[in-house]
């Protein structure tokens, strides 16, 4: 999924609390939810990413990525697996498209592998990569399924990391722009919805602060986990370069392709909702601060031309500045907001210096601690992942927050879902009984529908994570988010109960 382990900067706290978590079975109930609960034209789809789905890492000229190197490094993936095969969608995409069509899905969100288009990140285009995505796009459209295409879902060509440390160098802005424009030229006549980046916040924090994602840079705990990196500066540099990359590409698209292709460009932001641990002023302010260091960090520049004032004051000179020209380029360059929302945490103020001394990172800069428990009680039922607690009400609260803070922007829910564990002791028959998942989607969608119908939020689509069980980054194959169960011995797909639930929802008209 987009965020596999997004809260791992607080992993020590979570592991201590994990044993206290409680679970309960959920019933498969629709609660009267139908397509008519949403506006005409509202889009339903599933989401995926190239690295988690495709496999075929050495086929048809694809170059290596930072995740290929990271996944093959001992100790980085919890089950010592890799995505060399993943769920083999590179060879099975026609089968998977039929699964989407059978459910009645309107759209499919997938990502393009940069290193399939440019094996070395720059230079000569790999025609085999262009051909593959043309086949995928055409096959989707032939079944009436609209492609929503992510240009960057974490799989940076390793060549660019080796050449100039990737997102830490401003050269990446130019190279990314060339890659993006190549995609506009090749696919833009049919692709009308582009997502330039998936969860840039997760990239900045997990890859350059905690070091738990590729390329695995950090300085927390005196470089105990990472050999290279600076957790106090690099996340902010990476974020800045990603924001400028989007703005640059948006400018290119609007000047050269918008008139003829009539598409839109957005970003998928990862957003945990934060509730104050208590009614104290300090905790209320802490929850606001945590959100500004998450969504505000990446969204505010596109709506206000700069980072939140809270970040400016707390991060100081370590937070890069936009020139006047850059601010003008960034401000207004977002056509829509993609929101990846899974869970909710309690947040409390923490003005102590312990975390600052131990970590000296973005978490320390927020002066907050976020956990899923209050007074020994979990904030909601837990899924399999230690960070994923089910709090459906937060979907509506979050949509209203986005509406109020950013003046009612166009929003797509580009990821939402929950996982089960991958246990050898659970039979296939029982693994397909995912009533907890159907309740999750029902309850989050119900709150989403209320935010649109009753609160006036401009939300235009919902993408479930995910169509298939898949390779979940640092969690490997231990986590199953799919509507379809995948047997990893032969990659065969089996429909879980949630598939029928979505079929019923999407076929309903009253």
From Swiss-Prot:
It is an enzyme of class 3 (hydrolase). Glycans are attached at residues 28, 120, 279, 331, 360. Residues 1-26 form the signal peptide. One of its GO terms (molecular function) is beta-glucosidase activity. One of its GO terms (biological process) is carbohydrate metabolic process. It catalyses: Hydrolysis of terminal, non-reducing beta-D-glucosyl residues with release of beta-D-glucose. The active site is at 199 (proton donor), 415 (nucleophile). A beta-D-glucoside binds at residues 52, 153, 198-199, 342, 415, 465, 472-473, 481. Disulfide bonds join 218-226. InterPro entries: Glyco_hydro_1 (IPR001360), Glyco_hydro_1_N_CS (IPR033132), Glycoside_hydrolase_SF (IPR017853). Keywords: Disulfide bond, Glycoprotein, Glycosidase, Hydrolase, Signal. Its EC number is 3.2.1.21. SUPFAM superfamilies: (Trans)glycosidases. Belongs to the glycosyl hydrolase 1 family. This is Beta-glucosidase 34. It comes from Oryza sativa subsp. japonica. The gene is BGLU34.
């Amino acid at each position: 999924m987009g965020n596999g382990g997004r809260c791992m900067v607080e992993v020590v706290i979570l592991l201590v609390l994990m044993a206290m978590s409680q679970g309960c079975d959920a019933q498969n109930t629709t609660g009267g939810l139908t397509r008519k609960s949403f506006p005409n034209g509202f889009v339903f789809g599933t989401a995926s990413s190239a690295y988690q789905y495709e496999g075929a890492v050495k086929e048809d000229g694809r170059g290596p990525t930072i995740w290929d190197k990271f996944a093959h490094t001992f100790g980085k993936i919890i089950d010592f697996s890799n995505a060399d095969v993943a769920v083999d969608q590179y060879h099975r995409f026609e089968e998977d498209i039929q699964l989407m069509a059978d459910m009645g899905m309107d759209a499919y969100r997938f990502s393009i592998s940069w290193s399939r288009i440019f094996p070395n990140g720059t230079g000569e285009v790999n025609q085999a990569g262009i051909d593959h995505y043309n086949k995928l796009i055409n096959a989707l459209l032939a079944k009436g399924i609209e492609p929503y295409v992510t240009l960057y879902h974490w799989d940076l060509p390793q060549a660019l990391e080796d050449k100039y440390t990737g997102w830490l160098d401003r050269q990446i802005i130019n190279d990314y722009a060339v890659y993006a424009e190549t995609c506009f030229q090749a696919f833009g006549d049919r692709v009308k919805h582009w997502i330039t980046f998936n969860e840039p916040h997760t990239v900045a924090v997990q890859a350059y602060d905690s070091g738990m994602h590729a390329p695995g840079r950090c300085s927390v705990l005196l470089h105990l986990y990472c050999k290279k990196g600076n957790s106090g500066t690099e996340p902010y540099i990476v974020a800045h370069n990603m924001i400028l990359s989007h703005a640059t590409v948006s400018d290119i698209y609007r000047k050269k392709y918008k008139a003829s292709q009539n598409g839109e460009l957005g970003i998928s932001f990862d957003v945990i909702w934060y509730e104050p641990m208590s009614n104290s002023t300090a905790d209320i302010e802490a929850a606001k601060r945590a959100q500004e260091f998450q969504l505000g960090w990446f969204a505010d520049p596109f709506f206000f031309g700069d980072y939140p004032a809270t970040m400016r004051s707390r991060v100081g000179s370590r937070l890069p500045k936009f020139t006047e020209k850059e601010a003008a380029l960034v401000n207004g360059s977002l056509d829509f907001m993609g929101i990846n929302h899974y869970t909710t945490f309690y947040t409390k103020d923490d003005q102590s210096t312990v975390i600052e001394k131990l970590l000296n990172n973005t978490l320390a800069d927020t002066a907050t601690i976020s956990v899923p428990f209050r007074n020994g009680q979990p904030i909601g039922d837990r899924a399999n992942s230690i960070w994923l607690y089910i709090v459906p009400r937060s979907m509506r609260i979050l949509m209203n927050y986005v509406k109020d803070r950013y003046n009612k922007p166009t929003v797509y829910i580009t990821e939402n879902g929950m996982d089960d564990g991958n246990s050898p002791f659970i039979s296939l028959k029982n693994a397909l009984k995912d009533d907890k998942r159907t309740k999750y989607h029902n309850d989050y969608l119900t709150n989403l529908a209320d935010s649109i119908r009753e609160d006036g939020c401009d939300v235009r689509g919902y993408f479930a994570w995910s169509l298939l069980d898949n390779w979940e980054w640092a969690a490997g194959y231990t986590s199953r988010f799919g509507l379809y169960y995948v047997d990893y011995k032969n990659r065969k797909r089996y429909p879980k109960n949630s598939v029928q639930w979505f079929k019923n929802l999407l076929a309903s008209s009253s």
